[in-house]
C-alpha cells in the first residue's frame, strides 16, 4: 500500500487499515474463509419465539450465526452487539470470561461493518430480547470503510441509487422491497410453468428493431462489421418459436429503449412476454388477470392493495371497455360512426388534442384522444381493448370492424401495465403494416419500426392463431411495493457517470 494512497484516506479509514494489518500479524486472515453456520436470525426468532428466559436457560441450546456487525456497546469485560444477516438482526451478548481474552480482543477491536461468526448459547436478556451468549467469535471479513450513519440509515437519494450496496445495508425497507421483487418474479414463473408454458431465451442483439414502437440503442459488431441494435422487445423471436411448434412460451428479460427517463421509465428495464397458440386476446386477457392477481396474492396476501393512499381492488375482476366507448364516456365524442381523417382532425382541434405530422388516419386521432383524456381516469384495473389498426402493427384486425384490432392494454393507477393482442399471423398483411410503419418512420416518427423480412418469411411457413402478452415487471413491482419511482425497484438504475 503506497504512502500516497494512505495520505488520501481519512482518519477512520487509516485506523481500519491499521486494524487489518494487526489481524494479519496475529495470524488472522483479515478477509476470512468459509464459515459454517447453523441458523440465521429469522430462524432463531421463529424457533424460540415462545420460549421464556428461564425455558431457554433450561434448554441450553447452541447456535452458530454469522453476519455484519451493525451495533456495538459496552465496556470492560461485557459487551452487546447486533449482527445483521439477510433475514434481519440478532443480538450478541459477549463476556470476556465466556469467550476468553484473545477472543474478547477480537470483539473489542471489531469495527461496525466487519463480518464476524459467533457460536454460543441461545438466551433471552432481562429486557426480553432473544440473543446469542457468545462462547466463540471468528473474524470473517474486515470493513475498511465506515458504514453510513447508523441511526438514520442512508438518506441521500443520489447515494442510494449509485451505491445500492450501502442502501441495502442501511435500509431494511429497501432490502425487503428487492426481496419482494424476486418473490414476485418467481411466483409469475411458477404460475406460468403450472399452465405448461416453456421459459425460453432469445437474442438481445438484433439486426432490426422490432416488436414495439420505440427508439433503439445502436451498437456495432466488430467481427462482422455491422451495426446492430439492443432489443426493444422479445416479440418477433418468440413468435418464431410459435411457428416452430412450441405452442406456449414466455421470456422474462431485459429490454432496452433509447428514450427519456422519468418516474416510470428507465432505458433498461425488465418485461415478460407470453405467447399461447390457439388462443385469442380474450384468452390472454384472462391469463393477464390471473398472472397479476397471483403475483399480488403471493406478495401482498388476499384482498385489495394500497397504493399511495388509494385502495386498488386488484383481487376483483378487472373492468373491460372498448377504447371508443371509453373516449365517448369521458369526452362525449363518438368515433363509432365512420368519418374522414379531416373530420377526425377537426374534432381533435375542437378538443385541443395535440396533433403530430404522422397522424394520417382516423385511427391515429382516436389513439390521441384516448391518451389525452382517458388514460388519466383509469385508476382501478381496467382492460381497454379495440385499438385502431394504425397503432397496432402486429395485432390482428377485429373481424367485425376492421378499423380496430383484437388488442388490449391493462391500466392501473392511470399507467399501462400490460399490452396484448391476438397476433397477426397473415404474412401479407404483416408486410403491408411493416411498410406503413417504415413510411411513418420517414415522416419523422422515431418510434416506428422498420421492416423485418426474416420475420415475414417465418410467418409464410404458417403460424397458428396465437395470443400474445407483454407486462412491465418493474411497474408491477412498483405497484406491489407501493413505490412511486422505478429507480426504487431497480437495483442499479441508469445514472449519469
UniProtKB/Swiss-Prot annotation:
Belongs to the class-II aminoacyl-tRNA synthetase family. This is Lysine--tRNA ligase. Its EC number is 6.1.1.6. The gene is lysS. Gene3D superfamilies: Bira Bifunctional Protein, Domain 2, Nucleic acid-binding proteins. It catalyses: tRNA(Lys) + L-lysine + ATP = L-lysyl-tRNA(Lys) + AMP + diphosphate. NCBIfam families: lysS_bact, PRK00484.1. Its cofactor is Mg(2+). Binds 3 Mg(2+) ions per subunit. Keywords: Aminoacyl-tRNA synthetase, ATP-binding, Cytoplasm, Ligase, Magnesium, Metal-binding, Nucleotide-binding, Protein biosynthesis. Mg(2+) 1 binds at residues 409, 416. GO terms for biological process: lysyl-tRNA aminoacylation. Homodimer. One of its GO terms (molecular function) is tRNA binding. Its main location: cytoplasm. It is found in: Cytoplasm. It is an enzyme of class 6 (ligase). Mg(2+) 2 binds at residue 416.
Amino acid at each position: 500500500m503506497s504512502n500516497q494512497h494512505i495520505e488520501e484516506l481519512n482518519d477512520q479509514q487509516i485506523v481500519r487499515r491499521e486494524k487489518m494489518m494487526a489481524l494479519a500479524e496475529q495470524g488472522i486472515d483479515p478477509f476470512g474463509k468459509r464459515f459454517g453456520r447453523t441458523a440465521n436470525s429469522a430462524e432463531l426468532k421463529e424457533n424460540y419465539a415462545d420460549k421464556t428466559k428461564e425455558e431457554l436457560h433450561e434448554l441450553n441450546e447452541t447456535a452458530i450465526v454469522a453476519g455484519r456487525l451493525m451495533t456495538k456497546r459496552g465496556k470492560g469485560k461485557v459487551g452487546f452487539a447486533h449482527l445483521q444477516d439477510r433475514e434481519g438482526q440478532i443480538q450478541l451478548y459477549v463476556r470476556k470470561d465466556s469467550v476468553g481474552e484473545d477472543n474478547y480482543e477480537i470483539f473489542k477491536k471489531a469495527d461496525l461493518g466487519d463480518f464476524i461468526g459467533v457460536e454460543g448459547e441461545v438466551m433471552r436478556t432481562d429486557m426480553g430480547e432473544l440473543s446469542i451468549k457468545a462462547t466463540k467469535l471468528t473474524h470473517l471479513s474486515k470493513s475498511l470503510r465506515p458504514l453510513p450513519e447508523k441511526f438514520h440509515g442512508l438518506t441521500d437519494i443520489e447515494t442510494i441509487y449509485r451505491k445500492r450496496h450501502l442502501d441495502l445495508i442501511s435500509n431494511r425497507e429497501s432490502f425487503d422491497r428487492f426481496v419482494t421483487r424476486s418473490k414476485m418474479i418467481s411466483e409469475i414463473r411458477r404460475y406460468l410453468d403450472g399452465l405448461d408454458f416453456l421459459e425460453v431465451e432469445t437474442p438481445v442483439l438484433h439486426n432490426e428493431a422490432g416488436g414495439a414502437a420505440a427508439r433503439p440503442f445502436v451498437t456495432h459488431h466488430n467481427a462482422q462489421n455491422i451495426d446492430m441494435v439492443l432489443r426493444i422487445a422479445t416479440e418477433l423471436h418468440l413468435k418464431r418459436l410459435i411457428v416452430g411448434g412450441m405452442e406456449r412460451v414466455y421470456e422474462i428479460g431485459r429490454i432496452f429503449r433509447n428514450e427519456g427517463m422519468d418516474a416510470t421509465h428507465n432505458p433498461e428495464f425488465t418485461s415478460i412476454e407470453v405467447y399461447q397458440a390457439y388462443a385469442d386476446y380474450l384468452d390472454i386477457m384472462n391469463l393477464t388477470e390471473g398472472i397479476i392477481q397471483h403475483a399480488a396474492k403471493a406478495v401482498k396476501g388476499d384482498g385489495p392493495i394500497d397504493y399511495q393512499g388509494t385502495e386498488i381492488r386488484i383481487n376483483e375482476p378487472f373492468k373491460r371497455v372498448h377504447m371508443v366507448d371509453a373516449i365517448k364516456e369521458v369526452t362525449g365524442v363518438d368515433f363509432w360512426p365512420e368519418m374522414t381523417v379531416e373530420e377526425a382532425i377537426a374534432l381533435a382541434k375542437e378538443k385541443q388534442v395535440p396533433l403530430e405530422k404522422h397522424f394520417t388516419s382516423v385511427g391515429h386521432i382516436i389513439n390521441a384522444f384516448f391518451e389525452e383524456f382517458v388514460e388519466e381516469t383509469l385508476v382501478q384495473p381496467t382492460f381497454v381493448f379495440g385499438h385502431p389498426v394504425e397503432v397496432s402493427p402486429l395485432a390482428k384486425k377485429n373481424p367485425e370492424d376492421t378499423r380496430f384490432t383484437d388488442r388490449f392494454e391493462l391500466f392501473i393507477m392511470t399507467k399501462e401495465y400490460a399490452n396484448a393482442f391476438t397476433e397477426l399471423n397473415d404474412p401479407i398483411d404483416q408486410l403491408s403494416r411493416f411498410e406503413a410503419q417504415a413510411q411513418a418512420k420517414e415522416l419523422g416518427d422515431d418510434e416506428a419500426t422498420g421492416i423485418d423480412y426474416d420475420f415475414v418469411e417465418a410467418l409464410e411457413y404458417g403460424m397458428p392463431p396465437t395470443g400474445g402478452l407483454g407486462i412491465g415487471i418493474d411497474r408491477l413491482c412498483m405497484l406491489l411495493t407501493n413505490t412511486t419511482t422505478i429507480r426504487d425497484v431497480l437495483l442499479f438504475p441508469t445514472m449519469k457517470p
